[in-house]
Amino acid sequence: MNKYLTLADGTQWIGTAIGDCQLEAAGRIVFNTGMTGYQETLTDPSYLNQMIAFTYPLIGNYGIDPTVAQAPTIGAQAIIVHELATFNDHYTSRQSLASFLTIHHVAGIEGVDTRDLTIHIRQTGAQMAILSNHPITDFEAQLATFAPQVLTATPLPVATTTIRPRVAILNFGEKAAITAELQARGADVVVLPPTASLKAVAAYHPDGILLSNGPGDPTDYHTYLATIRQLAQRYPLAGICLGHQLIALAYGAQTYQLSFGHHGLNHPVQACADGRIIMTSQNHDYAVDPASIKGTPLIVTHTELNDGSIEGLRLPHQAVMSVQFHPEAHPGPQEAGQFFDDFLLTIQKEAVVNA
């Protein structure tokens, strides 16, 4: 059956329905330039309320491996591809991408020239879009019929080990790979809801706090900023992606929306201290405003080489550090994992100082 992709500016593409074929969807359209990693991308909670257009022309050729999912469900509202593979040729595959989309009730469209779509987004900026079963005649009226999705809050867990160091992750939409990277380095991890009070966090006796990635506009999380500052006074604090932006806001900086976001696996980032360049995985539509850093205690540690946007921050006299990119990758290059080593080393040093 036909599927219609309509952008807010009236531009339309017609293709064939995939996934949950009868389902219609709406969300902010973004493009992802990764040649691989579609499963990790689709299950990244940061893509909540977004429709992902994959620029690589063939998606789904190595199927679905349940061990690499970043969350139990698909975060994206819809998937847009040029061609969906009819085979899944990999020894780890347990099902096709087509069946994965159907089981998780995700709408999709194939037969779209996603590179043409990407050029259009780059020229006009990110915008809302609707994936429908019929042509759209009144975009705003149709858009009003869709309700945005919200993440389910994580309950308070039960700490079952005495392993040190213990890192408490405030889960704004955490990818599973973040926990895995910390555990691979010997840390115990407890994942807490972002609404956890200082008292609730303290009950787990953490040695450090990590603010996770997550979806949406960072200014929508303003109610957490005071708690973030209080946590930074008591524990070493790190932030990834949204967590990075929240640390910036908590210390007086501002954020802004990028024209079309960073969504891909090959973003070059340079460390300000030594000039070292790493390739990073990125997924964000907002960034910290460089002009707003002046007058705050924050110091820029990393920048993106394509557009000069801020990719890392720290506080010089507190154990606070953050990065805009995804050091855990999954998908993407593994060059940025040093961030976790640095954070755990900071925790170790703070433990010695406070002993």
Swiss-Prot record:
InterPro entries (alphabetical): Anth_synth/Amidotransfase, CarbamoylP_synth_ssu, CarbamoylP_synth_ssu_N, CarbP_synth_ssu_N_sf, Class_I_gatase-like, CPSase_GATase1, GATASE
Q: Where is this region: CPSase?
A: 1-162
Q: Which reaction does it catalyse?
A: hydrogencarbonate + L-glutamine + 2 ATP + H2O = carbamoyl phosphate + L-glutamate + 2 ADP + phosphate + 2 H(+)
Q: List residues of the Glutamine amidotransferase type-1 domain.
A: 166-353
Write out the pathway annotation from the protein's UniProt entry: Amino-acid biosynthesis; L-arginine biosynthesis; carbamoyl phosphate from bicarbonate: step 1/1
> Keywords on this record?
Amino-acid biosynthesis, Arginine biosynthesis, ATP-binding, Glutamine amidotransferase, Ligase, Nucleotide-binding
- Record-linked HAMAP family: CPSase_S_chain (MF_01209)
UniProt function note? Small subunit of the glutamine-dependent carbamoyl phosphate synthetase (CPSase). CPSase catalyzes the formation of carbamoyl phosphate from the ammonia moiety of glutamine, carbonate, and phosphate donated by ATP, constituting the first step of the biosynthetic pathway leading to arginine and/or urea. The small subunit (glutamine amidotransferase) binds and cleaves glutamine to supply the large subunit with the substrate ammonia.
The record ties this protein, via PANTHER family, to: CARBAMOYL-PHOSPHATE SYNTHASE SMALL CHAIN (PTHR43418:SF7), MULTIFUNCTIONAL TRYPTOPHAN BIOSYNTHESIS PROTEIN-RELATED (PTHR43418)
Record's protein name:
Carbamoyl phosphate synthase arginine-specific small chain
